[in-house]
């Protein structure tokens, strides 16, 4: 099984890189894992949301299991997240983190689950 973290953003601050590397190494023990950073669009508002969502969606395959991170999503406990992942080990799991302006409704509907880590919005480094 493969897990891809697909995010809009830029290269992380040097102090963040070791944490991301360690997290991906821990994921790689049971899974093939990667992080793909797609650059910000350079637009603002709705234009940025549309452009970035299109670029995110262009990376998706029809049978990918999509988890979209969004503050309006469901809160999951660790056992619930574990069960969700185990139930989809036969699929490529893609975790999407949108840009500052969020994602389009089209991408929202494409997600198999919308997951909220918190009702707060955090910088990508976290």
Task: Walk through the language-model features, giving the residues of each.
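Post-transcriptional modification and biogenesis factors for structured RNAs
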Residues: 1-126
């Amino acid at each position: 099984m493969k897990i891809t973290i697909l995010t809009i953003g830029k290269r992380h601050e040097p102090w963040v890189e070791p944490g991301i590397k360690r997290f991906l190494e821990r994921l790689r023990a049971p899974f093939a894992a990667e992080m793909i950073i797609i650059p910000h669009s350079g637009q603002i508002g709705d234009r940025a949301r549309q452009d970035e969502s299109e670029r995110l969606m262009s990376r998706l395959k029809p049978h990918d299991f999509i988890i979209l991170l969004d503050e309006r999503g469901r809160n999951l406990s660790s056992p619930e997240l574990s069960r969700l992942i185990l139930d989809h080990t036969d699929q490529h799991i893609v975790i999407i983190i949108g840009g500052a302006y969020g994602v389009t409704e089209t991408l929202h509907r494409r997600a198999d689950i919308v997951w909220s880590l918190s009702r707060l919005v955090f910088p990508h480094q976290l």
